[in-house]
Amino acid sequence: MKKAIALLLLTYFSGLAHAGEDAVDCDNAMNTLEINHCAALELESAQVELDKYLAASFEHNAEDTELVGAIKVAQESWKAYMTTHCDSVYTQWRDGSIRGLMALSCKTKLTKQRTHEVWENFLTYMDSTPPVLPEPKLME
């Protein structure tokens, strides 16, 4: 009986994992799997935006190779910080089903903050010249 239940659950979870993004209505996510799936999508979107802003900062400052190198080093250090910090958030909530959501939310928040910092420091001007890219939104 236990094997049958385990097989049924495995089949269900596998199907949910392969169902694709359209299978989950993130505005009405109802269970931990759906909520975590939607949080992962939000993190992925934030990461894509960060990558876009980093690429623009590299291109915008291409003539200053020292600056581009420094941004890249800072980005690697930031990634290490974000990972270890959000891993500690996961550990804080390790005994609850909310642990995954808390860690994903932590990563999303820090990623959006990092995107804003990249924009503010490397894609804007001190005068009234419009920025290279629009100001990214922080988490609400």
Identify the meaning behind each predicted range.
Residues 12-16:
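N-terminal signal peptide c-region/cleavage motif recognized by signal peptidases
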Residues 18-140:
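N-terminal alpha-helical modules
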Residues 1-4:
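Positively charged n-region of N-terminal signal peptides that target proteins for export
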Residues 8-9, 120:
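A periodicity- and composition-biased signal for non-globular, repetitive helical segments
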